[in-house]
Amino acid sequence: MSKVYDWFEERLEIQAIADDITSKYVPPHVNIFYCLGGITLTCFLVQVATGFAMTFYYRPTVTEAFASVQYIMTEVNFGWLIRSVHRWSASMMVLMTILHVFRVYLTGGFKKPRELTWVTGVVLAVLTASFGVTGYSLPWDQIGYWAVKIVTGVPEAIPVIGSPLVELLRGSASVGQSTLTRFYSLHTFVLPLLTAVFMLMHFLMIRKQGISGPL
């Protein structure tokens, strides 16, 4: 086993990377509230794992979506647990994101030179809210359907571009299969990809600049 490790160590300098990760200075003022961002990341990873598991059984059609969710909850081994963890983790992710934003704002973590870190964090907060909106509709039950209808109807109040924007969101003049397909694509591909990219940028900047000092 040591020979295998030595082979990788010689080429990748694994120990140097590990030392760099574990030896980062942590300011003495840091407390449990500085862990909220890490908890949000953990929730996101749980979301990815449980969401991926459900894609094997979920069917994104207006005629089969609700039945497929029922199938996951009643027939799939531990399906009820996977979906429940997904829902609980989603709620936790939203809560942790809100608390994290407030913590950073109240402690002045958005000030120079961390403006870009703050901007990426705000983008991540918007993406988190978008996860909630798109995921809420996927069971395609009464609550999900009417939530989508209301949310996608909001832009209609915008002058000139309101109606085209509503049609772009819905995929047609009314809420239906095109809307569900769009929301499913956003929830399972577009939003996770964007979130992963912005999280990487966010963490690299934190890694480079370190944790902000006390007020």
UniProtKB/Swiss-Prot annotation:
Belongs to the cytochrome b family. PetB subfamily. The 4 large subunits of the cytochrome b6-f complex are cytochrome b6, subunit IV (17 kDa polypeptide, PetD), cytochrome f and the Rieske protein, while the 4 small subunits are PetG, PetL, PetM and PetN. The complex functions as a dimer. GO terms for cellular component: chloroplast thylakoid membrane. This is Cytochrome b6. Keywords: Chloroplast, Electron transport, Heme, Iron, Membrane, Metal-binding, Photosynthesis, Plastid, Thylakoid, Transmembrane, Transmembrane helix, Transport. Its main location: plastid. Component of the cytochrome b6-f complex, which mediates electron transfer between photosystem II (PSII) and photosystem I (PSI), cyclic electron flow around PSI, and state transitions. It comes from the Eukaryota. The keyword Nucleotidyltransferase does not apply. One of its GO terms (biological process) is photosynthesis. Heme b 2 binds at residues 86, 187. Binds 2 heme b groups non-covalently with two histidine residues as axial ligands. It comes from Citrus sinensis (Sweet orange). The chain crosses the membrane at residues 32-52, 90-110, 116-136, 186-206. The keyword Zinc-finger does not apply. GO terms for molecular function: electron transporter, transferring electrons within cytochrome b6/f complex of photosystem II activity; metal ion binding; oxidoreductase activity. Heme b 1 binds at residues 100, 202. Its cofactor is heme b; heme c. It holds the Pfam family Cytochrome_B. It is a multi-pass membrane protein. It is found in: Plastid, Chloroplast thylakoid membrane. Heme c binds at residue 35. Heme 1 (or BH or b566) is high-potential and absorbs at about 566 nm, and heme 2 (or BL or b562) is low-potential and absorbs at about 562 nm.
